[in-house]
C-alpha cells in the first residue's frame, strides 16, 4: 500500500520538478553534441584572436586654459565670476575638417598602400610565423578615377628595384626612383623593402573619405568635468603611424589656437588705431574751449565742492568709456545673452545712474561754475581716454608679437605597447559561453518541440494499455545505419536484400528479450478471443510494425508452435527481403485468384515459421483485402496454425488495417519511440474501434534509454519490465 503525504503541495510542483529533471536529462543525453559545439565555438574564438590584426591605441593630453582675453578685456575680470574653460567647442574643433584636413595633407593620408595577403587568414598567419611585412615608400602618387569609380592598382615587386604596376586597363613596368606615368596614373616609388613577388594594393581616396576614416578612429574626451584637460585617442594597426597622426592633430590644433589669438589682437589693434586720432582731436577741442571760456571769464576757478564733483564725474566717464571699448570687443565674441555681455551691460547701467545723480548736483551750482565744470570734465575725460588708448595700443602690440594662445600640449602622443584589440582571453571566454549557450539552447528547444511518445505513461494517460516496451537494438542499428543513410526512398530501401534478422542472428539482444515478454502477455490476452489470429499495425510509417511482427513470429516459433506470417501490406511490404524468400507468388496473387494457397505459402527455415509475402503490388490493395478469399484464408490459417500474425499497413495512412482487423481475434498497434505522438496513437485506436476491430493495446517500439526519460518518468527496462518510482 502506498502512503501519500497530505502536506505535499499540489501536483504542479512535482510536475515542475519532473520537467526540470527531464531537461537536465536532455542535456546529459546530448552531452557529446554540447561539448562538440562548445569546443567548436571556442576554437573559432581562439583562431579569431590569433589571426585577427592587433589594434593599438595612442593618446595625448591637451590643456585648454581659461581665455585671458586681450588688453581691451583685461579689466573685465573684476565684474564677472571666474568661469571654467568651455571644452565642448574645443572638442568639436579638434574633430573638425579644418584640423584633420591639415593632418591628412601633412602625412599624405589620402594615399593607401596595403600589402596583399591570402584572404581572411593570410595577414594573421604571416604575423604568427613572424614574417616581416614589406615596406613601400611613395614620394608621389596620383590615381584618377575610372568611369566614376576609384581605381585600385596592384604593384608586384621585382628584382633589383624593378616592379610591375597593373591596373584594370594596363600593365607597365617601373623602377625605384623613376617617375612612372600611364593613362593618367603618376607614381614615384622612393624605396621598396620587400621580397620579390610581394604584392601591394595602391589606391587614392578623396580628402573627405580620408577625413571620415580618420574621424572613425579618433576620439576626444574631457578627462574630468570642467577640468579643461582633453584626452585625444586614436586606434589603428600601425603604432608608429597613429602616433604621428595624433601628434600632427595636436600641433595643428595648437597652431590654429595661436593664430586665432593673434587675429583677435590684430583686430583690436586696428580698432584702437582708428580711434586714437578721433579721441586726440576731441581732446584738443575740449582744451581749447576751456581756455577760451576762462579767458572770457577772467580765469574762473572751481571751488572745493565743484572739484570733488568733477573728479567723480570724470571717474564715471572714464569707466563708461572703458566699457564702450570693452563692448566693441565683446560684441565680436559673444551674444548679448552671454553672462560676460550681461555683466558689462549691468555695469554700464549702474554707472549711468551714478552719472545722472552727479549731474543733478552740478545743476544746483551757479551757471558759471556749471560751465567750467562741464568744460573741465570734457578735458579730463578726453585726456584719460586718450592715455588709456595709448597704453592699450602698446599692450596689444606686445601681445600680438608674443601670442601663445590658451592651449598647450601636456603629454605628446604615445602608443600603448599592448594592443587593445582583440582581447584574447575575453574572446575565448565569450566563444565558450556562446557555444555553450547555442548548443544548450538547441537541445532544449528540440526537447520542447519534440512531441513523440517517450514513455508508456504518456499512452496510459490516454487510456491506452501498453503491452510491451521494446528497446532499440544497438546491434541491428549498427548494421543498418549505412542502408538508412542511402539517398533512396523508403520503398527502395525496403527492396534491399540481406537485411539482418535479429531474432535469429542475435537472439540474446535486449529487443528480442522484450518480444519474448510480449509473447507471454499475448498468451493471456488471446485466451478468450474467437480465433488465434493476431493483427499488428502501426500508427504511421516507420513505426517498426514489421520488425515487431516478424520477431514475434520467430520467438513464438521457437517455442514449438506452428506460426504463419502474412504480409498484408500490399503497398510497401518488404518481408520477402527480410526473410530472403521469393515474392513472385504472394498474397496479392492469391486474393486475385491467380494462385492457390499451396503456391503462396513458403517456409522460412531460418525463423522456423511459414510466410505469405505480399506478392506483386496490385492497383487496388484495399479491394483485394475486402474479398471473401481473404476471409477464407484467415479461417483456413486459424485451423491449421497455432498462431497467425498479419502485418498490415499503418492505420493513419490507409484503411487496410480496419478491413483486415474485422476478421482477426486480437490486434495490437505499434508506436515508435519519439516518432509517434500520443494523439496519433489515440486516433488510430479510435478508428480501429469504430471499424469494429478488437484492439487490445499498443507496443512502444524502439525505446532509447535516455537520462531525460528516466528522470522524467522514472522507468527502466530489461526486456519488458518497467517500474514506477514512488
Swiss-Prot record:
Source domain of life is Bacteria
| Keywords on record | ATP-binding, Cell inner membrane, Cell membrane, Kinase, Membrane, Nucleotide-binding, Phosphoprotein, Transferase, Transmembrane, Transmembrane helix, Tyrosine-protein kinase
Q: Which Pfam families does the entry mention?
A: AAA_31, GNVR, WZC_N, Wzz
The record's subcellular locations are: Cell inner membrane
Top-level class of the enzyme under EC nomenclature: transferase
Q: What is its EC number?
A: 2.7.10.-
Q: How does it sit in the membrane?
A: Multi-pass membrane protein
Record PTM: Autophosphorylated. Dephosphorylated by etp.
Catalysis: reaction(s) = L-tyrosyl-[protein] + ATP = O-phospho-L-tyrosyl-[protein] + ADP + H(+)
User: Which residue ranges are assigned to the Cytoplasmic compartment in the record's topology?
Assistant: 1-32, 446-726
Which parts of the sequence lie on the Periplasmic side of the lipid bilayer?
54-424
Q: Which GO terms describe its molecular function?
A: ATP binding; protein tyrosine kinase activity
Q: Which GO terms describe its cellular component?
A: plasma membrane
Q: What InterPro entries has UniProt attached to this entry?
A: AAA_dom, Bact_polysacc_biosynth/exp, GNVR, LPS_length_determ_N_term, P-loop_NTPase, Wzc-like_C
Q: Where are the transmembrane segments?
A: 33-53, 425-445
Task: Output the NCBIfam families linked to this UniProt entry.
Answer: eps_fam, PRK09841.1
Which protein family is named in the record?
Belongs to the etk/wzc family.
Q: What is this protein called?
A: Tyrosine-protein kinase etk
Per the UniProt record, the source organism is Escherichia coli O157:H7
The gene from which this protein is expressed is etk
